[in-house]
Amino acid sequence: MKWKILLTDGLAKISDQALLDSVELVDRKGITAEELLEEIDPFDAVIVRGRTKITDAVLNVAKNLKVVGRMGVGVDNIDLKAAKTHGVTVVNAPVATTVSVAELTLGLMLSLIRGIPKADSGMKAGNWLKKQLRGTELYQKTLGVIGFGHIGESVAKRAMAFDMRVIAFDPIRSEDEIKAVGAEPVSFEELLKRSDIITMHIPHIKSTHHLLDDKAFSLMKDQVLIICAARGGVIDEQALLAALESGKVAGAALDVYESEPPGTHPLPMHPNVIGTPHIGAQTKEAQLRAGFDILSEVVAALDQKPLRWKIV
């Protein structure tokens, strides 16, 4: 018997034929919330990205559902409490996008510190802005990494290649684990006070909602730079906007927003903000890894085999 798996947001091409032979994949990319409620009942598992919401209402009608797979890291679009109540296993693919998000973070950092987007737009407008665009170096700057999981650690390693000093705050990882990478473990408050650049790599959960708020910004160095390619909601966007307007924050580079897309929100429109449309995992390699990893993990869960990335 083949496991019947619903794909709500597509899946990268899988080359493992044995894995494919064990499942029946039904691709319903772009399925609406209403259609999902109507169609999910026959499926043993569903694989989603960030767009599709797996709510208590969905789980209530999904009588055959055994597993929810999240292609990527964040599971804030899945009601984990409801999944546990319904006896549905939730798994993700947390390492598949690590390299891509880490590389984007460094790209945003370099773009911000050297004013690369402004230089490019100036050239396209026929303006030679050489004298106006005086940046600074990453060399010997203090990078504060909030969240030292797979991505945070990968960012730290790449930053060290630029001879940056890396300090890190993570409430879960031990000081020895952080030190082993070459970073200095510090408290959240100390990180805010010492960092020249702050980059965030944490999930958006109750305890991290608006972690960077007015109080946090008040503790930071003047002219600090903020990078976030994690999840919208971990930064209070109004507080960041106020800090940019006051000059406390010299610039920010954001790949994620509280509301996506952010529309005409003034934050991504600010002249000292570089914005990208949540493209951290949008590379060919990351999507291939994520597709294989999540399908393998979902099938393992259905077969009741040991799991690498079980959430609930």
Feature annotation, model-predicted:
Residues 21, 131-222:
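Rossmann-like dinucleotide/phosphate-binding beta-alpha-beta segment
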